[in-house]
A protein has these predicted regions:
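Membrane-embedded helix-loop-helix hairpins and adjacent transmembrane boundary segments
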Residues: 1-380
Length: 380
């Protein structure tokens, strides 16, 4: 894309688009690492900084060796695994354990409570604050007010306070921001251009249309299964945890125990490695062709460009690991800023404006007579 810009508008425009291209790749990779590290820490207890630094190595190893071909092959395989996990979760929520009627009834009961009823039912005064993943004082859990956050009562800005309406003020605003903001991000993201150029011309347009339809199934299915199940079951997931994308692991762990945690980790790793590989290839392409060959060595051979690409993949992975750790250490708000784009996994949680979460709610319980692994094997 940057080469097209240089040929049409010259050096100044080329450098401008090159800068925004790098920014887009860094932002997307940051969201992958920060969201992935938060989930890994919540489910396994691995140190957040360590997880953020180690995750890129799964991308570096095969991307630097296989290049764009390895990225395409791995993405296809990873997508199959992701869809398998999504189908399992939807089947569990709406067929195996609950039904659409039950989930609807639970949600209707949740939004029927008034604020006074919610406070009376879910008051935790004088008790230890506990969320789904953590326990501690209100300050330690990030609860800024004396009253814990809770998922109870009607949703402000939604028609009739429902979680199931399309008439949502917050949802409309999110849609506008997402379309406007992510359109620019996609336009300057080299990974999309590489996929289009690598495909046959007659297959590129059809491929992107079908790919968009297939992608839509993932956030839509996760939001309407794990997202709504979290609200229906009133799981003790705090607002900050929901914003960090921890709703799916909470629901999966609640329904399947360790088996659910393993499935979410597998799905998460597949998504991170697949997208991270594409972003790494995009950065290496920008550096090799738009920086090295354009401004440093115009007479570069194919072998030299390949060597530069592989070096950049390794260096970019190391840089992003350190970048994620530094932001996590230096400013916890960066995670919230990044995740508010809902770009990592918009289906992993409902929109943040719909959450009013309590940190200590356990209303509905699942009968524990059948182990989670037996339930999963029976489903399969």
């Amino acid at each position: 894309m940057c080469e097209i810009v240089r040929a049409r508008w010259g050096k100044a425009a080329h450098i401008t688009f090159l800068f925004f291209g790098f920014c887009a790749n860094i932002i997307v990779t940051s969201m992958l690492l920060l969201g992935g590290a938060a989930t890994v820490q919540a489910l396994t207890g691995v140190n957040y900084a360590l997880a953020a630094f180690l995750i890129p190595w799964g991308v570096i190893l095969y991307t630097s060796a296989g290049g764009l071909k390895a990225t395409f092959m791995a993405s296809y395989l990873h997508t199959m695994i992701i869809f398998t996990v999504v189908i399992i979760m939807v089947t569990l929520v709406y067929i195996k354990i609950y039904s659409s009627d039950q989930v609807y009834s639970f949600l209707a009961q949740t939004v029927a409570y008034s604020d006074e009823q919610c406070m009376a039912i879910f008051s935790t005064e004088g008790t230890q604050e506990t969320s789904f993943f953590y326990s501690g004082t209100a300050d330690q859990l990030g609860l800024t007010s004396g009253t814990p956050q809770y998922s109870c009562g009607p949703v402000q800005g939604n028609k009739q306070g429902s979680y199931l309406t399309m008439l949502s003020g917050g949802g409309l605003m999110f849609g506008i921001i997402n379309i406007v903001g992510n359109f620019g991000t996609v336009f300057v993201d080299q990974s999309y251009w590489q996929s289009a150029i690598a495909a046959r011309p007659e297959a590129a347009a059809k491929g992107y249309l079908l790919g968009g339809i297939c992608w839509f199934a993932i956030p839509f299915s996760l939001a309407t299964s794990l997202g709504l199940a979290s609200m229906a079951l009133m799981l003790p997931v705090t607002r900050s945890e929901a914003g960090a994308g921890l709703v799916p692991p909470a629901v999966a762990d609640y329904l399947l125990g360790n088996a659910g945690a393993v499935l979410i980790l597998i799905m998460l790793f597949m998504a991170i490695v697949s997208t991270g590989s594409a972003e790494s290839i995009a950065v290496s392409s920008l550096v090799a062709y738009d920086v090295y060959r354009e401004y440093i060595n115009p007479e570069a051979t194919g072998k030299q460009i390949l060597w530069v690409s592989r070096v950049v993949i390794v260096l970019f992975g190391l840089f992003m690991g350190l970048f994620a750790v530094s932001f996590m250490r230096g400013s916890g708000s960066f995670l919230r800023i990044v995740l508010k784009k809902e770009f990592i996994s918009p289906g992993f949680s409902l929109h943040h404006s719909t959450y009013r979460l309590h940190s200590t709610i356990w209303v509905l319980t699942l009968d524990g007579s059948t182990s989670s692994w037996e339930l999963l094997l029976d489903l399969l």
